[in-house]
Amino acid sequence: MSQTDVLDLYKQAGAFHEGRFLLASGRQSPYFMQSTTLLQHPRALMELGGLMSQKILDAGLKPDFIVGPAMGGVTLAYEVARQLSETLPDVRAIFAEKDGSGGMKLREAFAVRPGETFVAVEDVLTTGGSLLRAVRAVEGQGGQCIGLCCIIDRRQQTGPLSGYPLMSLKELYFDTYASHEVPGWLAERPLQEI
């Protein structure tokens, strides 16, 4: 599957939107990609999970588990781990969830042994904040992050993720704006909070 095909999957599923959107980062964008609309389809999830697991294998990584930030990364982490488990010994899937104080935490049932390696997965990276909070939650339990993998990398700067190897199925850059930077053509559109 080519990079163009990944974007086509979003469009075909009605998961690529044009308008004016307030992103989780607080920035505004003329585009929004709603991965849950796409990933509710098992065939799309299997295809994307397969591409991501192949990227991980091609990079020579052999994680003990895959972690995704809740909610969007939960099914993705499971599917990537499932497909990696066809090649590697029992790769687990876990998720990190909000802890109520701006960070993330793991459920008690997700035991991480010190030194276990993991890859963190995400659907769309805009700032990387959610993924970084998930990584830090696992590192706080003794896990060692050996890579990051996403479907779409929208970041225009490496930012806080620069210390980790990143793999993506597609890089897609379009401008985002702070509220005081929104150009007139975009300001004319109704703002949709997502």
From Swiss-Prot:
The gene coding this protein: pyrE
Assembly mode: Homodimer.
SUPFAM superfamilies in UniProt: PRTase-like
A GO term, aspect molecular function: magnesium ion binding
NCBIfam families, per database record: pyrE_Therm (TIGR01367)
Record organism: Deinococcus radiodurans (strain ATCC 13939 / DSM 20539 / JCM 16871 / CCUG 27074 / LMG 4051 / NBRC 15346 / NCIMB 9279 / VKM B-1422 / R1)
GO terms for biological process, alphabetical: 'de novo' UMP biosynthetic process; pyrimidine nucleobase biosynthetic process; UMP biosynthetic process
Annotated protein name in UniProt: Orotate phosphoribosyltransferase
Sequence positions that bind orotate: T126, R154
InterPro entries xrefs: OPRT, Orotate_PRibTrfase_bac, PRibTrfase_dom, PRTase-like
